[in-house]
């Protein structure tokens, strides 16, 4: 019998891990430079925690039960878990809270495909306790900084505003609103043309479909929709954000007020980070503002503003494979320590430990015996080991540099 991973699961071998760590380390350096601190939440959550924001479909969650028959689920995303942790464990800390994560998530994928991946790796940030222009700009600029740190140049940001889009949909009859929303989300003009709408509402829906492009054109189009004071203020805030982002130089933005995320807890800006180089566009990450989500977990229902984004490690990996930046080999050891005979075993362990205690990271292997000198030298060449330390019983040594 050949034992295989469970359907949808996979193993990461040493080179896979080295490449994944390369990406994660680059992102972590950026998060630290922006003053963010790592949070680690439970892989298992109560189902009521995961479902509180009405953002996650129950059938997506891989469910378990504990001994008390309590419904549990493997987290399909991190924001709900972090929201729970912040309002229950971090209430005495001052805002804003700048948090980042690097974790795996699990989603049940209902497709007729064997071994459809169900475990994913993500990295992202949550900026909690503050709203407004500067907080929005910080998170978007941080996302751009992450891509720059990875050496990615051909990307753009698709920026929408859930509050504006939702309020524009309020003009449609309740019984048709969901269909209009779905048609706009899928850029489905045929459905818009066939729904039983008045001429005025049909034209409004068509305009909403076309609210995508450069910021000047989109903001001009949306302003033609007879906005009320609240809607106009949201448009003005969006314009201020775009101007701030673009004032610092090249920040590739496509404004898209038809952008409707499947996650429904977003209340303000929403965005997707899209790679341009593939023949087919690849979404590298997404995020948005969720000023009412934390209130669902707060004991007194107090709303705490929040905004964040997630980057998909697998999608970043696929793009980076084409750039030749990822490690092509696992790290080589610096030393191979070889006891010349059994009496030298103790001295060999002592010398290897001395090398490992260097202030800098030094990778040291110990030869475990059973081979002759030529085989040991060939092993060192095959493993790209830089030096061999031949250890005698009295602790003296001969250093051999290995020619590759």
Swiss-Prot record:
It is found in: Cytoplasm. PROSITE patterns: AA_TRNA_LIGASE_II. Keywords: Amino-acid biosynthesis, Cytoplasm, Histidine biosynthesis. GO terms for molecular function: histidine-tRNA ligase activity. The keyword rRNA-binding does not apply. Its main location: cytoplasm. One of its GO terms (cellular component) is cytoplasm. The keyword Amino-acid biosynthesis applies. Pathway: Amino-acid biosynthesis; L-histidine biosynthesis; L-histidine from 5-phospho-alpha-D-ribose 1-diphosphate: step 1/9. GO terms for biological process: histidyl-tRNA aminoacylation; L-histidine biosynthetic process. Belongs to the class-II aminoacyl-tRNA synthetase family. HisZ subfamily. This function is generally fulfilled by the C-terminal part of HisG, which is missing in some bacteria such as this one. Required for the first step of histidine biosynthesis. May allow the feedback regulation of ATP phosphoribosyltransferase activity by histidine. Heteromultimer composed of HisG and HisZ subunits. This is ATP phosphoribosyltransferase regulatory subunit.
